[in-house]
Amino acid sequence: MKAIIVFTAALAAAYATWAAQPLLTPAQLQPMLRNPDLRVIDIRDPQSFEMGHIEGAVNAPYGQWLGPAGNIGIVPELAALTRLVQSAGLTPSTHAVVVSSGVDAGDFGATARVYWTLKSLGLTELSILNGGMMDWDSEGEMTDMGPGTPVAPSQFAPRFNPEWLATRDEVKESLRKNSALLVDARPDVFYLGKFRAPMALVAGTLPGAKQLDFNQWFVPGTARFADVEKTRQVATQFQSTQNPQGKPIITFCNTGYWSATDWFAFSEILGRKDVRMYAGSAVDWTQSKEPPPMDNQPSRAESLAYDARQWWNRKFK
């Protein structure tokens, strides 16, 4: 009997250690589904969820984790997030595994943003299914169909921890003091001011920002996050060329989506403690009453020409 108790305790300890891994492969996740403290959070749309999902998964579409229509990157009200995590049956001791479609590297940003939100709400056992449902299906793992099995709501009353959040005022203060490095996770067309998000009022990047395109963290052509060695190589190259002083990092993008991937790489994979995300990102920055000039900001004539092209495309294409 004593041997059985010792073995059981050792198994529980091993699971606790394993559960903390930020990335899980389908093969790693599958045997963990039997654990009652694990909850798969599928953030795809309801139709995709019903066509096939992981056994026991709860559908909490990504749109439910977003802020107001004017800038979806803003962190939602705590009351809304509380209702969401309670309806998913989450508690502080739940091991939550966030799952998306896995169609491309951009899709990973949604899982990273939900992971960031759950961490900020107090969950400590968090993972992302690397490669999403695309890898789950391609490896032949079983799926259930239909709306899923209802779960009992929890009474979890979270508090939002701002440790990993940077606000607009905090970004302005960091610029004034030159105390942090702003890291733009967007591709070239946004960083160089050739294109802007629909809700952004100005194209370009935040003053002094350095670019670290979120795509660099992935196995090319997939939504699969690269291994730790490749992640460390990307981060080391960036640090040596763009952040030799080793300043704290504030990541941003358009609406706190791609920037969640950069945050995840530095904070969760590499273990840096001085990384925050500007959730409102470029849209919030450009919507302020008196935003400082952007870097790579197009001229007024270029902006007017861009607006005209966008209007034409919406009207006639």
Show the residue positions of the predicted features.
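Phosphate-coordinating loops and pocket residues in cytosolic domains that bind phosphorylated ligands
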Residues: 51, 138, 287
